[in-house]
Structure formats: C-alpha cells, structure tokens
Amino acid sequence: MNPLIMSIIMSTIILGTLIVMTSSHWLMIWIGFEMNMLAIIPMLMKHHNPRSTEAATKYFFTQATASMLLMLAVIINLMYSGQWTGMKLFNPTASIIMTLALTMKLGLAPFHFWVPEVAQGIPLSSGLILLTWQKLAPLTVLYMISPAINLYLLLTMSMASIAIGGWGGLNQTQLRKIMAYSSIAHMGWMTAILIYNPTMTLLNLVIYILMTTTMFMLLMINSSTTTLSLSHMWNKMPLITTITLVTLLSLGGLPPLTGFLPKWMIIQELTKNDSIILPTLMAITALLNLFFYMRITYATSLTMFPTTNNMKIKWQFENTKHLNLLTPMIVLSTLTLPLAPMMTILN
C-alpha cells in the first residue's frame, strides 16, 4: 500500500477513536465510530484476495448493524431526556440497546461470531489493530455509561464470552483464530468487572493490549500463522519461538506471568462484592484458555524430533535484529506480576 495512503488511513483510524474518547455529544460519538469503521476497512483488504474481501464485508455489516443500534439508543434517550450531551441514560430500553450495540462492536457473546472469521482472513498487522486499537472506543463508551448498564445483562454476556473464548479455541490450529478467541475471553473478563470497578477494566485492557501486541509482533517476525508453522520455527529461531510460547502462556493467565495479574485482581474484586459463584465459574472456564495454550506449547517445544539445522548462521540472525524494539514489550507482558502490591491503589 502507498505510504501516503497508509498514513492517511492510520490517521483517520486514530482520529475516529480520539473523537469517541473525548466527546460528550452522542452525535459526535457516532461520527467517531463511523470514521473508525470506514477507515479500517482498507486495512483489512490490504492483501487483494477473496478471504480479505470476505473478512472486510463481514466486519462492515456487523459494525454497521451495531452503529444502527447505537443511533437507535441515542434517539430513544433523546426522546426522554431532550438533550444530545451527557453520558446519563434516562431510559432502560436505551441502556439495553446501547449495551447490545457496544458489545457487538467489541465482539462479546452472543455477537462474537464475526471476530474469528474476520481475524482469520486478514494479515497479521491488520489483526493486531483489529484486536487491540479497535477495542478502545467501545470500551470507553461502556466505561462512561457504566452506571446505567443493566448489571445482569452485562454479567451474563461476560460469562458467555469467557466460556465461548475457551471452548472456541480448543480445536483451533490457526493462530489468528486462537488470538481472536483469546480476545473474546479477555473482553469477557474486562466487562465482568466494569460496573464494580471500572478502573480495573482499564488495567486489564492495558495488560491485554501489551500481551496481544507482543504476540502479534513475534508472529510477524517468524511469519507463523498456524501451530505447525510455529513448530517448524524452533530450529530456525529458538529464542523467538521460546518467547512466543511464554507470551502465549501469559495470555492464558498462568502464574507467575503478567497475564495472571488482571485475573487475580478481578476475582478478588468480585469476591469483595459478595459475588462467589461468578468468579468461581470464571476461574474454572479460564482453564480452557490455558489448556489450549499449553497444548500449543507442548506440541511446539516438547515434542521435537532430532534434526540437523542446515540453515546459514547469517540467516538465523537476520530476524533477531527487531528484538531491540520487542524487549520492553516482552518484559511488560511476562514479568510484571511483582508489581501486584502497587495495584492496591485501584481499590
């Protein structure tokens, strides 16, 4: 893609998100969502093939439906409040419709079907934007309207997302689909704590973006899109492959890695709010995610057969030059659990 066109598209994506995050006028928020959606579609179709076109079409229809529901909720709220500004929702129907619209944009269950399909059909770089940056705007609006959200509706969708994020990834060999199901599960964890402690949602979002960005950057370096291709990388780039597997385990929430921190804090916060059954179910269901990450780790690193490496040494080290940029990301996404005592400021 032409660098000038790419810079314009990226600027529009960033501008659309910033408009949503900084506006208190519902029409401007809707416009920000539309700018963001229309700008990212060329990014999804960066590679001209039928799969990318299909993925972009699915993304467009889903986001357009969500935008339509969002505008419907805004109009219903306008009828009861008489104003476009302010984040307070005056009608329970408007609150429910807006929650459904925003969760559809996020990819929460039962509106999760588009996430794996779109992620599988697009390049890794576009998948990184889709699963990280594109979550900021809907989560910001959910954060702002959290006092008016129906608690039981959001908790039901959160629990369903965590369960589907675990079950859906069990039989997958495509790494992009695995990352998509991981995204669905993480969104479930974020929205489960949103009403009780919105600040903890932001902590979870930051850690999720760090881990997902690190994972996609590693996959882009070793050009792996399936578990089979990842296992072949072991003899070529052992360091990159090892870090990739550790980052995967961190995404699954295995202690003592960084990914365990938000799960620990969320379960603790839910327990403080006299919720016992929900965090228990969430913890049990999170084991599904950890299982398929462990399976990838086992298949990639623990079942290697003896081979000789015929690759030239120079070729081996060509791809490690990008590690300088990755080093802080890797540290943050795997080794920040000792910072847990500092998180008491969130309570």
Curated annotation (Swiss-Prot):
Reaction equation(s) it catalyzes: a ubiquinone + NADH + 5 H(+)(in) = a ubiquinol + NAD(+) + 4 H(+)(out)
Keyword S-adenosyl-L-methionine: no
Oligomer and partners: Core subunit of respiratory chain NADH dehydrogenase (Complex I) which is composed of 45 different subunits. Interacts with TMEM242.
Class in the EC hierarchy, top level: translocase
Segments crossing the lipid bilayer: 13-33, 59-79, 96-116, 127-147, 148-168, 178-198, 201-221, 237-257, 274-294, 325-345
Originating organism: Cheiromeles parvidens
UniProt signal peptide: none
Compartmental location: Mitochondrion inner membrane
UniProt function note: Core subunit of the mitochondrial membrane respiratory chain NADH dehydrogenase (Complex I) which catalyzes electron transfer from NADH through the respiratory chain, using ubiquinone as an electron acceptor. Essential for the catalytic activity and assembly of complex I.
Keyword Translocase in record: yes
EC number: 7.1.1.2
PANTHER family: NADH-UBIQUINONE OXIDOREDUCTASE CHAIN 2
GO CC term (a single one): mitochondrial inner membrane
Family to which this protein belongs: Belongs to the complex I subunit 2 family.
Gene Ontology MF terms: NADH dehydrogenase (ubiquinone) activity
Protein keywords: Electron transport, Membrane, Mitochondrion, Mitochondrion inner membrane, NAD, Respiratory chain, Translocase, Transmembrane, Transmembrane helix, Transport, Ubiquinone
Gene Ontology biological process terms from the UniProt entry: mitochondrial electron transport, NADH to ubiquinone; mitochondrial respiratory chain complex I assembly
Protein name: NADH-ubiquinone oxidoreductase chain 2
